[in-house]
Amino acid sequence: MEKILFINASEYDSGNTSRLGHENLNGIDYDQLNLVDYKIFQLGQHFDDDQFEEVISKMKIADTWVICTPVYWHNMSGRLKVWLDRMSEYPHSMWYGKKLVLGVQGMEPSDTIGPMRHLMKRFCDLNQMEFLGEATTNRKIKGLNHGLKKLD
């Protein structure tokens, strides 16, 4: 049985982005990680109270990550960007074989989804992960949900 981790990159733990993740994972057993609940400092900053290792420990035990972000100024949230930057501190081989789904939520994410899809596919390629797809609409969510249920 696959272990699925929903990574919510919104400032709200139960807002529209969280709902997108919940719809994508409807009927599937998963854990939720809200990036807003952790102190994650910028790449290059070193503080004793940084909690990125706690995030990493949850990610290590998951087989599939469902990452959802709101669109702010035609791009991913700052939390997701910091998460991506910090991921570069870890060996790519740590994530070998894991799977990733991207959820993008916003009023009009169409101009954002292409560059974000490219970025996440590149991230998956570098880390030897499998990119399962992205969702911005209910129809797309239903298709990804069906695929995730096969993993569960």
Indicate residue ranges for each PLM-predicted region.
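Serine-hydrolase catalytic core
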Residues: 93
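N-terminal beta1-alpha1-beta2 submodule of the flavodoxin-like/Rossmannoid cofactor-binding fold
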Residues: 1-90, 121, 125-127, 132-152
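Short, glycine-/small-residue-rich phosphate/pyrophosphate-handling segment
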Residues: 96-135
